[in-house]
């Protein structure tokens, strides 16, 4: 029978503690029987070390009775020596050989808790919700402390649907964002991201800016409200709003584009993902006269949007070509993924509106960004932070990895 023991080291972190512990373990093995390292976890939190090591030994046939007791006694002497030499505390306890096999059944998931700041009740609520559906938190690590604080909990023994349902109420009552992602290679294998433009990549709605310059803001607002109430579909409402722009000088498009304000964190998100090898693009129900120059400015790989018809230097109030609506956005995602040879499960889509839902559902990860409740409820996960680069934490990237990927002189 294999004898196993857990050594727990705590104290002020300093160079050489881990090396001294494992060197001492090697000597124990030499004195008795070979010692094997079964498991190791180490974390340093604000200079305080917590190191856990599970070691085991398998006595040879014909070994003397009491071998396990001698093994534990040797580890006890080791703990005292390492503790004195390193200024740390080392505890030793026997553990069950089947301890690792006793973990809850089910696939593991990452639960990401984000906030500005993260209140204790958010972590408490998440932990209670996880335990309430039979899950277990195996590990916690901080992903970022800026621009949002975020923590990643590795959870076993709970299914994604149950986790999302249990955590949704916690997010609603605490104001924190809580995302769920399955542990595995697919999380870090994402290779393409598609972003909505209005109220996602940029602040505000381009068509509202154009309508204001045309003196038709109130009319366009009424059409938008009718669409939101289900009285018009997106294509009908788009045509009606574009018709209200008839006669507007084409130069106004340049003026509006020059005054666009990127959502905070947009440049950081795109630059980081580009340096990590992502294909990045935009899919918009807006207009190519705005989105194409924006895509070029940001170094994006692709863009899809509607095209305003122009005649004699003025908008005609019509559109050219196929309309990019809810279905059109989803088709664009599929087209871009196929062009770059990337499976849909390795794609990410980010948007805020109902016309983004098909795209969010098709992507491997669909993120509702500052969206209305019915959009948040149907997306894989939701972010209500003002910073677009919080998407990086949902993907599992730490603040340190982001800083390594983006030059410090870059603007957000």
Predicted ranges, named:
Residues 196-198, 229, 312:
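Residue-level recognition of short loop/turn positions
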Residues 247-365, 369-412:
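C-terminal cap/substrate-recognition subdomain and adjoining C-terminal extension
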Residues 209-272:
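A metal-dependent, Asp-based hydrolase signature
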Residues 157, 198, 267:
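Active-site pocket-lining segments that scaffold enzyme catalytic pockets across diverse folds
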